[in-house]
Protein backbone atom coordinates (compact mmCIF):
# COMPACT_ATOMS: atom_id res chain seq x y z
CA UNK A 1 0.00 0.00 0.00
CA UNK A 2 2.88 2.36 0.77
CA UNK A 3 4.31 1.70 -2.67
CA UNK A 4 0.98 2.59 -4.23
CA UNK A 5 0.85 5.77 -2.21
CA UNK A 6 4.33 6.78 -3.31
CA UNK A 7 3.49 5.99 -6.92
CA UNK A 8 0.26 7.93 -7.02
CA UNK A 9 1.72 10.67 -4.90
CA UNK A 10 4.49 11.25 -7.43
CA UNK A 11 2.23 11.20 -10.46
CA UNK A 12 -0.85 12.94 -9.13
CA UNK A 13 -1.96 15.33 -6.48
CA UNK A 14 -3.67 13.59 -3.58
CA UNK A 15 -6.71 15.39 -2.23
CA UNK A 16 -7.70 14.94 1.40
CA UNK A 17 -11.40 15.12 2.13
CA UNK A 18 -13.13 16.03 5.33
CA UNK A 19 -16.74 15.90 6.44
CA UNK A 20 -16.59 19.28 8.14
CA UNK A 21 -17.50 21.02 4.91
CA UNK A 22 -14.50 23.37 5.11
CA UNK A 23 -13.48 22.60 1.53
CA UNK A 24 -10.76 20.60 -0.20
CA UNK A 25 -7.10 21.28 0.39
CA UNK A 26 -4.81 19.72 -2.23
CA UNK A 27 -1.45 18.55 -0.97
CA UNK A 28 1.44 16.98 -2.75
CA UNK A 29 4.79 15.56 -1.74
CA UNK A 30 7.15 18.34 -0.84
CA UNK A 31 4.49 20.98 -1.29
CA UNK A 32 2.86 23.20 1.26
CA UNK A 33 -0.83 23.96 1.57
CA UNK A 34 -2.22 25.40 -1.61
CA UNK A 35 -5.20 27.57 -2.26
CA UNK A 36 -8.27 26.27 -0.47
CA UNK A 37 -11.36 25.63 -2.56
CA UNK A 38 -14.27 27.38 -0.92
CA UNK A 39 -17.46 25.35 -1.37
CA UNK A 40 -20.72 26.91 -2.35
CA UNK A 41 -23.31 27.81 0.20
CA UNK A 42 -24.98 24.78 1.70
CA UNK A 43 -28.44 24.29 0.29
CA UNK A 44 -31.43 22.25 1.34
CA UNK A 45 -31.06 18.55 0.66
CA UNK A 46 -33.80 16.08 -0.15
CA UNK A 47 -31.87 13.17 1.40
CA UNK A 48 -29.25 13.68 4.10
CA UNK A 49 -25.89 11.96 4.03
CA UNK A 50 -27.13 9.53 6.67
CA UNK A 51 -30.11 8.56 4.49
CA UNK A 52 -32.84 10.47 6.29
CA UNK A 53 -35.38 12.08 3.97
CA UNK A 54 -36.11 15.74 4.71
CA UNK A 55 -39.84 15.51 4.09
CA UNK A 56 -42.59 16.46 6.53
CA UNK A 57 -46.26 15.71 5.92
CA UNK A 58 -48.54 18.54 6.96
CA UNK A 59 -52.21 19.52 6.80
CA UNK A 60 -53.39 15.92 6.81
CA UNK A 61 -56.74 16.82 8.34
CA UNK A 62 -59.00 13.81 8.60
CA UNK A 63 -56.39 11.62 6.95
CA UNK A 64 -54.65 11.27 10.32
CA UNK A 65 -57.10 8.52 11.23
CA UNK A 66 -55.42 6.31 8.66
CA UNK A 67 -52.51 5.85 11.07
CA UNK A 68 -54.83 4.13 13.56
CA UNK A 69 -55.98 1.63 10.95
CA UNK A 70 -52.44 0.23 10.95
CA UNK A 71 -51.62 0.69 14.61
CA UNK A 72 -48.88 -1.92 14.75
CA UNK A 73 -46.84 -0.30 11.97
CA UNK A 74 -47.46 3.10 13.55
CA UNK A 75 -45.98 1.91 16.85
CA UNK A 76 -43.00 0.33 15.13
CA UNK A 77 -42.26 3.53 13.21
CA UNK A 78 -42.25 5.64 16.39
CA UNK A 79 -39.01 6.65 18.00
CA UNK A 80 -37.61 4.57 20.83
CA UNK A 81 -38.55 7.01 23.57
CA UNK A 82 -42.18 6.96 22.50
CA UNK A 83 -42.15 3.17 22.23
CA UNK A 84 -40.83 2.80 25.77
CA UNK A 85 -43.33 5.32 27.07
CA UNK A 86 -46.26 3.46 25.46
CA UNK A 87 -44.89 0.12 26.65
CA UNK A 88 -44.67 1.22 30.30
CA UNK A 89 -47.94 3.15 30.20
CA UNK A 90 -49.90 0.25 28.72
CA UNK A 91 -48.72 -2.28 31.30
CA UNK A 92 -49.25 0.17 34.17
CA UNK A 93 -52.80 0.97 33.12
CA UNK A 94 -53.62 -2.72 32.55
CA UNK A 95 -52.28 -3.72 35.95
CA UNK A 96 -54.07 -0.94 37.80
CA UNK A 97 -57.32 -1.66 35.98
CA UNK A 98 -57.28 -5.39 36.75
CA UNK A 99 -56.21 -4.83 40.36
CA UNK A 100 -59.11 -2.41 40.72
CA UNK A 101 -61.51 -5.05 39.37
CA UNK A 102 -60.37 -7.54 42.01
CA UNK A 103 -60.69 -4.91 44.72
CA UNK A 104 -64.24 -4.05 43.54
CA UNK A 105 -65.29 -7.71 43.76
CA UNK A 106 -63.88 -7.98 47.28
CA UNK A 107 -65.54 -4.70 48.29
CA UNK A 108 -68.99 -5.64 46.91
CA UNK A 109 -68.92 -9.05 48.62
CA UNK A 110 -67.79 -7.55 51.94
CA UNK A 111 -64.55 -9.49 51.99
CA UNK A 112 -62.63 -6.44 53.20
CA UNK A 113 -64.57 -6.38 56.53
CA UNK A 114 -65.14 -10.14 57.00
CA UNK A 115 -61.74 -11.38 55.98
CA UNK A 116 -60.69 -12.18 59.57
CA UNK A 117 -63.89 -14.08 60.48
CA UNK A 118 -63.03 -17.73 61.12
CA UNK A 119 -65.87 -19.51 59.25
CA UNK A 120 -66.16 -16.95 56.38
CA UNK A 121 -64.97 -17.93 52.86
CA UNK A 122 -63.97 -14.86 50.79
CA UNK A 123 -63.74 -14.65 46.97
CA UNK A 124 -59.97 -14.31 47.11
CA UNK A 125 -58.24 -15.47 50.23
CA UNK A 126 -56.01 -13.01 52.08
CA UNK A 127 -57.15 -9.94 50.10
CA UNK A 128 -57.88 -7.22 52.64
CA UNK A 129 -57.29 -3.97 50.73
CA UNK A 130 -56.17 -2.53 47.35
CA UNK A 131 -52.44 -3.31 47.74
CA UNK A 132 -53.24 -6.94 48.50
CA UNK A 133 -55.55 -7.04 45.46
CA UNK A 134 -52.77 -5.54 43.31
CA UNK A 135 -50.27 -8.14 44.54
CA UNK A 136 -52.74 -10.93 43.77
CA UNK A 137 -53.10 -9.68 40.20
CA UNK A 138 -49.30 -9.47 39.67
CA UNK A 139 -48.80 -12.97 41.08
CA UNK A 140 -51.49 -14.33 38.79
CA UNK A 141 -50.42 -12.40 35.65
CA UNK A 142 -46.75 -13.22 36.03
CA UNK A 143 -47.56 -16.83 37.03
CA UNK A 144 -45.46 -16.45 40.17
CA UNK A 145 -47.97 -18.26 42.41
CA UNK A 146 -46.77 -17.76 45.99
CA UNK A 147 -49.81 -19.71 47.22
CA UNK A 148 -50.78 -17.25 49.92
CA UNK A 149 -53.54 -15.57 47.87
CA UNK A 150 -55.87 -17.73 45.78
CA UNK A 151 -59.40 -17.84 44.34
CA UNK A 152 -61.98 -19.94 46.15
CA UNK A 153 -64.83 -21.91 44.61
CA UNK A 154 -67.43 -19.72 46.33
CA UNK A 155 -66.83 -16.80 43.88
CA UNK A 156 -68.12 -17.36 40.31
CA UNK A 157 -67.51 -13.70 39.37
CA UNK A 158 -63.89 -14.13 40.38
CA UNK A 159 -63.54 -17.10 38.03
CA UNK A 160 -64.97 -15.08 35.13
CA UNK A 161 -62.64 -12.17 35.90
CA UNK A 162 -59.70 -14.53 36.04
CA UNK A 163 -60.49 -15.82 32.52
CA UNK A 164 -60.83 -12.25 31.21
CA UNK A 165 -57.52 -11.34 32.84
CA UNK A 166 -55.73 -14.24 31.15
CA UNK A 167 -57.06 -13.33 27.69
CA UNK A 168 -56.36 -9.61 28.09
CA UNK A 169 -52.86 -10.27 29.40
CA UNK A 170 -52.02 -12.50 26.44
CA UNK A 171 -53.21 -9.85 23.97
CA UNK A 172 -51.22 -7.07 25.63
CA UNK A 173 -48.09 -9.22 25.81
CA UNK A 174 -48.31 -10.29 22.19
CA UNK A 175 -48.91 -6.75 20.96
CA UNK A 176 -46.31 -4.85 22.98
CA UNK A 177 -43.62 -7.50 23.15
CA UNK A 178 -44.03 -8.23 19.44
CA UNK A 179 -43.77 -4.53 18.66
CA UNK A 180 -40.59 -4.20 20.69
CA UNK A 181 -39.08 -7.30 19.11
CA UNK A 182 -39.77 -6.09 15.57
CA UNK A 183 -38.32 -2.70 16.36
CA UNK A 184 -35.19 -4.19 17.90
CA UNK A 185 -34.68 -6.60 15.00
CA UNK A 186 -35.10 -3.95 12.30
CA UNK A 187 -32.06 -3.87 9.99
CA UNK A 188 -31.71 -0.11 10.20
CA UNK A 189 -28.63 -0.45 12.35
CA UNK A 190 -27.18 -2.84 9.79
CA UNK A 191 -27.13 0.08 7.39
CA UNK A 192 -24.79 1.89 9.78
CA UNK A 193 -22.01 -0.48 8.73
CA UNK A 194 -22.55 0.23 5.02
CA UNK A 195 -20.34 3.11 3.88
CA UNK A 196 -20.62 5.56 1.02
CA UNK A 197 -17.87 7.88 -0.13
CA UNK A 198 -18.26 11.48 0.94
CA UNK A 199 -17.83 12.71 -2.62
CA UNK A 200 -18.61 11.48 -6.10
CA UNK A 201 -16.10 12.01 -8.90
CA UNK A 202 -16.25 12.52 -12.66
CA UNK A 203 -13.29 11.35 -14.74
CA UNK A 204 -12.42 9.21 -17.73
CA UNK A 205 -12.70 5.43 -17.47
CA UNK A 206 -12.25 3.15 -20.47
CA UNK A 207 -12.27 6.20 -22.72
CA UNK A 208 -15.66 7.42 -21.51
CA UNK A 209 -16.61 10.21 -19.14
CA UNK A 210 -17.98 8.48 -16.03
CA UNK A 211 -19.64 9.49 -12.78
CA UNK A 212 -18.30 7.32 -9.93
CA UNK A 213 -18.77 6.86 -6.20
CA UNK A 214 -17.65 4.19 -3.75
CA UNK A 215 -19.56 1.83 -1.42
CA UNK A 216 -18.20 -0.49 1.26
CA UNK A 217 -19.28 -3.05 3.85
CA UNK A 218 -17.59 -2.94 7.26
CA UNK A 219 -18.93 -6.29 8.48
CA UNK A 220 -17.67 -9.72 7.53
CA UNK A 221 -21.24 -10.92 7.04
CA UNK A 222 -22.35 -10.50 3.46
CA UNK A 223 -25.27 -8.66 1.94
CA UNK A 224 -27.21 -11.22 -0.08
CA UNK A 225 -28.63 -10.05 -3.44
CA UNK A 226 -27.23 -6.56 -2.98
CA UNK A 227 -28.52 -4.13 -5.59
CA UNK A 228 -27.85 -0.44 -6.09
CA UNK A 229 -29.96 2.23 -7.76
CA UNK A 230 -29.41 5.92 -8.45
CA UNK A 231 -31.94 8.71 -8.86
CA UNK A 232 -31.27 12.19 -10.17
CA UNK A 233 -33.41 14.88 -8.53
CA UNK A 234 -33.51 18.07 -10.54
CA UNK A 235 -35.99 20.89 -11.04
CA UNK A 236 -37.20 21.53 -14.56
CA UNK A 237 -39.97 23.18 -16.51
CA UNK A 238 -41.97 21.34 -19.15
CA UNK A 239 -42.71 22.83 -22.60
CA UNK A 240 -46.26 23.41 -21.38
CA UNK A 241 -44.98 25.67 -18.61
CA UNK A 242 -45.42 23.23 -15.71
CA UNK A 243 -42.70 23.49 -13.06
CA UNK A 244 -41.48 20.21 -11.55
CA UNK A 245 -39.52 20.98 -8.36
CA UNK A 246 -38.23 17.43 -7.77
CA UNK A 247 -38.24 15.58 -11.07
CA UNK A 248 -36.80 12.08 -10.64
CA UNK A 249 -34.65 10.56 -13.39
CA UNK A 250 -33.03 7.13 -13.34
CA UNK A 251 -29.25 6.88 -13.70
CA UNK A 252 -28.04 3.73 -15.40
CA UNK A 253 -25.43 2.01 -13.22
CA UNK A 254 -25.37 -1.24 -15.17
CA UNK A 255 -28.93 -2.50 -15.49
CA UNK A 256 -28.34 -4.08 -18.90
CA UNK A 257 -24.98 -5.65 -17.98
CA UNK A 258 -25.85 -6.74 -14.43
CA UNK A 259 -23.30 -4.41 -12.86
CA UNK A 260 -25.97 -3.14 -10.46
CA UNK A 261 -25.95 -6.56 -8.73
CA UNK A 262 -23.13 -6.23 -6.21
CA UNK A 263 -20.88 -8.77 -4.53
CA UNK A 264 -20.12 -6.46 -1.64
CA UNK A 265 -17.17 -8.15 0.05
CA UNK A 266 -14.71 -5.31 -0.49
CA UNK A 267 -15.24 -1.64 -1.42
CA UNK A 268 -16.63 -1.23 -4.92
CA UNK A 269 -16.70 1.75 -7.27
CA UNK A 270 -20.11 2.28 -8.86
CA UNK A 271 -19.98 3.79 -12.34
CA UNK A 272 -22.50 5.68 -14.43
CA UNK A 273 -21.30 6.14 -18.01
CA UNK A 274 -22.23 9.58 -19.34
CA UNK A 275 -23.49 9.17 -22.89
CA UNK A 276 -26.30 10.46 -25.08
CA UNK A 277 -28.89 8.67 -22.92
CA UNK A 278 -27.55 10.08 -19.66
CA UNK A 279 -29.13 13.14 -17.99
CA UNK A 280 -25.56 14.48 -17.65
CA UNK A 281 -25.02 14.45 -21.43
CA UNK A 282 -24.52 18.24 -21.58
CA UNK A 283 -22.86 18.60 -18.15
CA UNK A 284 -19.40 20.18 -18.22
CA UNK A 285 -17.02 21.45 -15.60
CA UNK A 286 -18.11 25.00 -16.31
CA UNK A 287 -21.84 24.27 -16.15
CA UNK A 288 -21.47 22.54 -12.78
CA UNK A 289 -20.95 25.96 -11.22
CA UNK A 290 -24.55 26.92 -12.02
CA UNK A 291 -26.31 23.53 -12.01
CA UNK A 292 -28.43 22.38 -9.08
CA UNK A 293 -29.08 18.68 -8.76
CA UNK A 294 -28.93 15.85 -6.25
CA UNK A 295 -27.96 12.24 -6.91
CA UNK A 296 -29.74 9.88 -4.50
CA UNK A 297 -28.08 6.47 -4.03
CA UNK A 298 -30.12 3.52 -2.71
CA UNK A 299 -28.39 0.28 -1.71
CA UNK A 300 -30.64 -2.70 -0.92
CA UNK A 301 -29.84 -6.22 0.18
CA UNK A 302 -30.76 -9.08 2.49
CA UNK A 303 -28.93 -9.36 5.79
CA UNK A 304 -27.23 -12.73 5.86
CA UNK A 305 -27.73 -13.33 9.60
CA UNK A 306 -31.40 -12.33 9.92
CA UNK A 307 -32.77 -12.71 6.39
CA UNK A 308 -34.39 -9.27 6.53
CA UNK A 309 -34.14 -6.66 3.81
CA UNK A 310 -31.82 -3.75 4.56
CA UNK A 311 -31.69 -0.42 2.75
CA UNK A 312 -29.01 2.23 3.00
CA UNK A 313 -29.30 5.67 1.40
CA UNK A 314 -27.19 8.72 0.77
CA UNK A 315 -27.03 11.59 -1.71
CA UNK A 316 -24.55 13.81 -3.53
CA UNK A 317 -25.29 17.42 -4.40
CA UNK A 318 -23.57 19.30 -7.21
CA UNK A 319 -20.93 20.72 -4.84
CA UNK A 320 -20.06 17.18 -3.69
CA UNK A 321 -19.18 16.00 -7.21
CA UNK A 322 -15.47 16.47 -7.99
CA UNK A 323 -14.57 16.95 -11.64
CA UNK A 324 -11.30 15.39 -12.74
CA UNK A 325 -10.75 13.19 -9.67
CA UNK A 326 -10.35 9.49 -9.05
CA UNK A 327 -10.62 7.39 -5.90
CA UNK A 328 -7.48 6.26 -4.17
CA UNK A 329 -6.85 2.47 -4.17
CA UNK A 330 -7.70 0.84 -0.84
CA UNK A 331 -7.06 -2.88 -1.52
CA UNK A 332 -3.59 -4.37 -1.18
CA UNK A 333 -2.37 -7.95 -1.42
CA UNK A 334 -0.86 -9.27 1.78
CA UNK A 335 0.49 -12.72 2.52
CA UNK A 336 -2.47 -15.02 2.02
CA UNK A 337 -5.25 -12.42 2.05
CA UNK A 338 -6.39 -9.05 0.73
CA UNK A 339 -6.29 -6.07 3.05
CA UNK A 340 -8.66 -3.11 2.85
CA UNK A 341 -7.40 0.23 4.13
CA UNK A 342 -10.51 2.19 5.09
CA UNK A 343 -8.44 5.22 6.06
CA UNK A 344 -8.21 6.02 2.32
CA UNK A 345 -11.84 5.16 1.59
CA UNK A 346 -12.85 8.79 0.94
CA UNK A 347 -9.50 9.99 -0.50
CA UNK A 348 -9.28 11.10 -4.14
CA UNK A 349 -6.55 12.36 -6.43
CA UNK A 350 -6.62 14.51 -9.55
CA UNK A 351 -6.32 13.01 -13.02
CA UNK A 352 -6.30 14.61 -16.48
CA UNK A 353 -9.92 15.02 -17.55
CA UNK A 354 -11.33 17.15 -20.38
CA UNK A 355 -13.48 19.97 -18.98
CA UNK A 356 -16.03 19.60 -21.76
CA UNK A 357 -19.32 17.75 -21.71
CA UNK A 358 -19.84 14.59 -23.73
CA UNK A 359 -22.05 16.53 -26.12
CA UNK A 360 -19.34 19.12 -26.72
CA UNK A 361 -16.71 16.41 -27.20
CA UNK A 362 -18.81 14.65 -29.82
CA UNK A 363 -19.43 17.92 -31.67
CA UNK A 364 -15.71 18.77 -31.69
CA UNK A 365 -14.85 15.27 -32.88
CA UNK A 366 -17.41 15.51 -35.67
CA UNK A 367 -16.07 18.86 -36.83
CA UNK A 368 -12.43 17.74 -36.80
CA UNK A 369 -12.85 14.36 -38.55
CA UNK A 370 -12.98 14.21 -42.41
CA UNK A 371 -16.10 12.97 -44.13
CA UNK A 372 -16.22 9.34 -45.19
CA UNK A 373 -17.38 10.17 -48.75
CA UNK A 374 -15.96 13.60 -49.79
CA UNK A 375 -18.04 15.68 -52.16
CA UNK A 376 -16.92 16.65 -55.71
CA UNK A 377 -14.99 19.85 -55.31
CA UNK A 378 -14.01 20.87 -58.87
CA UNK A 379 -15.66 21.18 -62.25
CA UNK A 380 -13.42 18.54 -63.88
CA UNK A 381 -14.69 15.79 -61.57
CA UNK A 382 -18.26 16.92 -62.13
CA UNK A 383 -17.68 16.84 -65.94
CA UNK A 384 -16.28 13.28 -65.75
CA UNK A 385 -19.27 12.18 -63.71
CA UNK A 386 -21.66 13.61 -66.27
CA UNK A 387 -19.77 11.85 -69.09
CA UNK A 388 -20.06 8.55 -67.25
CA UNK A 389 -23.79 9.01 -66.95
CA UNK A 390 -24.12 9.98 -70.59
CA UNK A 391 -22.07 6.95 -71.61
CA UNK A 392 -24.72 4.68 -70.18
CA UNK A 393 -27.20 6.06 -72.69
CA UNK A 394 -24.70 5.88 -75.60
CA UNK A 395 -24.10 2.15 -75.15
CA UNK A 396 -27.14 1.44 -77.29
CA UNK A 397 -25.30 2.84 -80.35
CA UNK A 398 -22.97 -0.17 -80.26
CA UNK A 399 -25.84 -2.63 -80.72
CA UNK A 400 -26.85 -4.04 -84.10
CA UNK A 401 -29.22 -1.90 -86.12
CA UNK A 402 -32.15 -4.25 -85.53
CA UNK A 403 -31.63 -4.06 -81.75
CA UNK A 404 -31.20 -0.30 -82.01
CA UNK A 405 -34.59 -0.10 -83.65
CA UNK A 406 -36.09 -2.36 -81.00
CA UNK A 407 -34.62 -0.30 -78.18
CA UNK A 408 -36.21 2.77 -79.63
CA UNK A 409 -39.59 1.50 -78.53
CA UNK A 410 -41.01 3.20 -75.46
CA UNK A 411 -42.13 -0.02 -73.82
CA UNK A 412 -38.74 -1.71 -74.14
CA UNK A 413 -37.03 -2.41 -70.79
CA UNK A 414 -34.63 0.35 -69.88
CA UNK A 415 -32.05 -2.13 -68.59
CA UNK A 416 -31.03 -2.99 -72.18
CA UNK A 417 -30.13 0.66 -72.73
CA UNK A 418 -27.41 0.30 -70.09
CA UNK A 419 -25.64 -2.78 -71.41
CA UNK A 420 -21.97 -2.51 -70.58
CA UNK A 421 -18.88 -4.13 -72.01
CA UNK A 422 -17.90 -5.55 -68.62
CA UNK A 423 -18.79 -9.09 -67.70
CA UNK A 424 -20.83 -8.11 -64.64
CA UNK A 425 -22.89 -5.60 -66.60
CA UNK A 426 -23.46 -8.13 -69.36
CA UNK A 427 -24.68 -10.69 -66.89
CA UNK A 428 -26.97 -8.11 -65.34
CA UNK A 429 -28.51 -7.17 -68.72
CA UNK A 430 -28.89 -10.69 -70.08
CA UNK A 431 -31.92 -11.30 -67.92
CA UNK A 432 -33.98 -9.05 -70.20
CA UNK A 433 -32.83 -10.62 -73.52
CA UNK A 434 -34.59 -13.51 -75.26
CA UNK A 435 -33.59 -16.99 -74.12
CA UNK A 436 -31.72 -17.75 -77.34
CA UNK A 437 -29.56 -14.67 -76.99
CA UNK A 438 -28.88 -15.51 -73.37
CA UNK A 439 -27.66 -19.00 -74.32
CA UNK A 440 -25.46 -17.59 -77.07
CA UNK A 441 -23.81 -15.00 -74.89
CA UNK A 442 -23.08 -17.64 -72.26
CA UNK A 443 -20.98 -19.70 -74.75
CA UNK A 444 -17.26 -18.90 -74.39
CA UNK A 445 -15.38 -17.49 -77.33
CA UNK A 446 -16.08 -14.58 -79.64
CA UNK A 447 -19.50 -13.95 -78.15
CA UNK A 448 -20.05 -10.63 -79.90
CA UNK A 449 -19.66 -12.09 -83.41
CA UNK A 450 -21.87 -15.05 -82.52
CA UNK A 451 -24.42 -12.71 -81.07
CA UNK A 452 -24.55 -10.65 -84.29
CA UNK A 453 -24.77 -13.68 -86.58
CA UNK A 454 -27.37 -15.41 -84.48
CA UNK A 455 -29.36 -12.21 -84.26
CA UNK A 456 -29.28 -11.96 -88.08
CA UNK A 457 -30.52 -15.54 -88.36
CA UNK A 458 -33.27 -14.93 -85.78
CA UNK A 459 -34.43 -11.84 -87.60
CA UNK A 460 -34.41 -13.59 -90.98
CA UNK A 461 -36.38 -16.60 -89.73
CA UNK A 462 -39.60 -14.66 -89.29
CA UNK A 463 -39.16 -13.32 -92.83
CA UNK A 464 -38.75 -16.85 -94.22
CA UNK A 465 -41.65 -18.10 -92.21
CA UNK A 466 -43.79 -15.28 -93.49
CA UNK A 467 -43.00 -16.24 -97.11
CA UNK A 468 -43.81 -19.86 -96.37
CA UNK A 469 -47.23 -18.82 -95.23
CA UNK A 470 -48.01 -17.18 -98.64
CA UNK A 471 -50.13 -18.89 -101.24
CA UNK A 472 -48.23 -21.26 -103.55
CA UNK A 473 -48.50 -18.84 -106.44
CA UNK A 474 -46.95 -16.05 -104.50
CA UNK A 475 -44.33 -18.38 -103.07
CA UNK A 476 -43.35 -19.32 -106.59
CA UNK A 477 -43.09 -15.69 -107.56
CA UNK A 478 -40.92 -15.06 -104.56
CA UNK A 479 -38.72 -18.00 -105.36
CA UNK A 480 -39.65 -20.15 -102.28
CA UNK A 481 -39.28 -19.48 -98.64
CA UNK A 482 -35.57 -20.17 -98.55
CA UNK A 483 -34.61 -17.92 -101.49
CA UNK A 484 -36.41 -14.76 -100.68
CA UNK A 485 -33.14 -12.80 -100.28
CA UNK A 486 -31.97 -13.85 -103.69
CA UNK A 487 -35.12 -12.59 -105.37
CA UNK A 488 -34.92 -9.14 -103.78
CA UNK A 489 -33.68 -6.25 -105.88
CA UNK A 490 -30.01 -5.43 -105.57
CA UNK A 491 -30.70 -2.11 -103.86
CA UNK A 492 -32.86 -3.76 -101.19
CA UNK A 493 -30.33 -6.57 -100.66
CA UNK A 494 -27.61 -3.96 -100.10
CA UNK A 495 -29.78 -2.02 -97.66
CA UNK A 496 -30.64 -5.20 -95.79
CA UNK A 497 -27.00 -6.25 -95.56
CA UNK A 498 -26.00 -2.80 -94.31
CA UNK A 499 -28.52 -3.04 -91.48
CA UNK A 500 -26.71 -6.04 -89.97
CA UNK A 501 -23.12 -4.83 -90.37
Swiss-Prot record:
The record's annotation in Gene3D superfamilies points to: 1.10.287.70, G protein-activated inward rectifier potassium channel 1
Q: Where is the composition biased (Low complexity)?
A: 18-37
Membrane topology (Cytoplasmic) = 1-80, 180-501
Subcellular localization, per the record?
Membrane
Q: Which residues carry this modification: Phosphoserine?
A: 385, 424
**According to its record, what are the GO cellular component terms?**
external side of plasma membrane; I(KACh) inward rectifier potassium channel complex; inward rectifier potassium channel complex; parallel fiber to Purkinje cell synapse; presynaptic membrane; T-tubule
Q: Where is the composition biased (Polar residues)?
A: 456-467
Molecular functions per Gene Ontology: G-protein activated inward rectifier potassium channel activity; phosphatidylinositol-4,5-bisphosphate binding; voltage-gated monoatomic ion channel activity involved in regulation of presynaptic membrane potential
Q: Where is this region: Disordered?
A: 1-40, 456-501
Family stated for the protein in its record: Belongs to the inward rectifier-type potassium channel (TC 1.A.2.1) family. KCNJ3 subfamily.
Q: What is its quaternary makeup?
A: Associates with KCNJ5/GIRK4 or KCNJ6/GIRK2 or KCNJ9/GIRK3 to form a functional G-protein activated heteromultimer pore-forming unit.
What protein name does the entry list?
G protein-activated inward rectifier potassium channel 1
Q: Which organism is it from?
A: Mus musculus
Q: Which gene encodes it?
A: Kcnj3
